[in-house]
Amino acid sequence: MRRPIIAGNWKMHNTTEEARDLVTLLRPLVGTARAEVVVCPPFTAIAATVNAASGSNISVGAQDLFWEDKGAYTGEVSGPMLRDLGCRYVIIGHSERRQYFGETDATVNKKLLAAYRNELLPIVCVGETLAEREAGHTLEVVGRQVREGLKGLETGQARDLVVAYEPVWAIGTGKTATAADAQEVIAFIRKTLGEMYGETAAAIRIQYGGSVKPENIAELMAQPDIDGALVGGASLDAVSFAAIVNYDQ
């Protein structure tokens, strides 16, 4: 039985004080959640978020990391630094990183291996653009992103992996893939993982991301292969995020 995982990606929002306030509001609202709860603040607010979440059932993740552990890489943040701050998870390959910062399947793969090297649990994002979907290339694109992004990952490591399917055309647009559309692609991702990792694929958690809201979470979570959500805007409001986390209550 795969435990559901709901992760909030705060993106470039929340100062340290705002992060502290949000987690303080969130703690009592999600304290009895069956799902695993993760929040991913910007780098500058990680320490404050970890402190505010201490002793609760809220884990903290980062939104990115660099693939080297140290060196002359101005502006970058490494796996050891994230571990030192108390991070448990790290998002890798988010569509905004691919769109604005030139992230590729190859850099996603290097970052994935860096995460495992530093005992961080990766949330690896995959998904097609609107043009790719309209051309009928969704499964081809997503399959390639999965295979290339996870290259070199051993079966024993894959059990702890989280994959997030986030169709690029549904990020921040208010558009959501239907639950059936999301299930179709996520079932394909699980099939691809099965070709790579055999029976272990049944244990890998796969999230949906893309305009997830309290209004659509239950229908998404009712699908057999959807194990959680990567939540953007709705995670910035404690009540909305808690409603998503507590979708089954």
Swiss-Prot record:
Pathways per UniProt: Carbohydrate biosynthesis; gluconeogenesis; Carbohydrate degradation; glycolysis; D-glyceraldehyde 3-phosphate from glycerone phosphate: step 1/1
Biological processes annotated in GO: gluconeogenesis; glyceraldehyde-3-phosphate biosynthetic process; glycerol catabolic process; glycolytic process
This protein's UniProt keywords: Cytoplasm, Gluconeogenesis, Glycolysis, Isomerase
Active site, renumbered: 94 (electrophile), 166 (proton acceptor)
GO cellular component: cytosol
InterPro entries referenced in this protein's UniProt entry, alphabetically: Aldolase_TIM, TIM_sf, TrioseP_Isoase_bac/euk, Triosephosphate_isomerase, Triosephosphate_isomerase_AS
Binding-site residues, substrate: 9-11, 172, 211, 232-233
EC id: 5.3.1.1
One Gene Ontology molecular-function label: triose-phosphate isomerase activity
Catalysed conversion reaction: D-glyceraldehyde 3-phosphate = dihydroxyacetone phosphate
Source organism, top-level taxon: Bacteria
UniProt main location, coarse: cytoplasm
Cell compartment(s), UniProt: Cytoplasm
SUPFAM superfamilies: Triosephosphate isomerase (TIM)
PROSITE patterns: TIM_1 (PS00171), TIM_2 (PS51440)
Subunit organization: Homodimer.
Function: Involved in the gluconeogenesis. Catalyzes stereospecifically the conversion of dihydroxyacetone phosphate (DHAP) to D-glyceraldehyde-3-phosphate (G3P).
Family affiliation: Belongs to the triosephosphate isomerase family.
Name of this protein: Triosephosphate isomerase
